[in-house]
Amino acid sequence: RMDYSRFVEHHRSTGADLTVAALPVDAAQAEAFGLMRTDEEGNIKEFREKPKGDSLKAMAVDTSRFGLSVESSKERPYLASMGIYVFSRKTLFDLLDANPGHKDFGKEVIPEALSRGDTLKSYVFDDYWEDIGTIGAFYEANLALTQQPTPPFSFYDEAFPIYTRPRFLPPSKFVD
């Protein structure tokens, strides 16, 4: 689970105009995402929405510099946008005021920020995250949460509670 306070702190400490949460992925997954090519400091130098072929290969980066093992970085050499962003207020307002027709971050807003010369940073997150943008993906992600004894994500973490509507009884937990 992502600690958004760390994400925001990273954005502030780097002085970025825009920070994009990134997930290391393999080539098969990469074609379904917006990908970013970064330098050693995590500055986003290029952003492409769902590249294929040679365009995809050009987006590979050394993900070991973001804390992945050498083996894992070879398996997952692409940084996929998670669709989670932190903007400086001025940057967001300037981008939207100058381009009121822009509606898609990956296809329009982020490339525009790059072309303007704004400072874009990546925030690499290497923990549980699922893209649930389709009904099938949503179904599979929910089904995976039933895996026992250890699902890929646990809702029972005292350090990071998930708040829902007020209840006076804890939720059910089934353990085999």
Indicate where each model-derived feature is located.
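Conserved core of the sugar-phosphate nucleotidyltransferase
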Residues: 2-86
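Left-handed beta-helix
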Residues: 65-75, 87-176
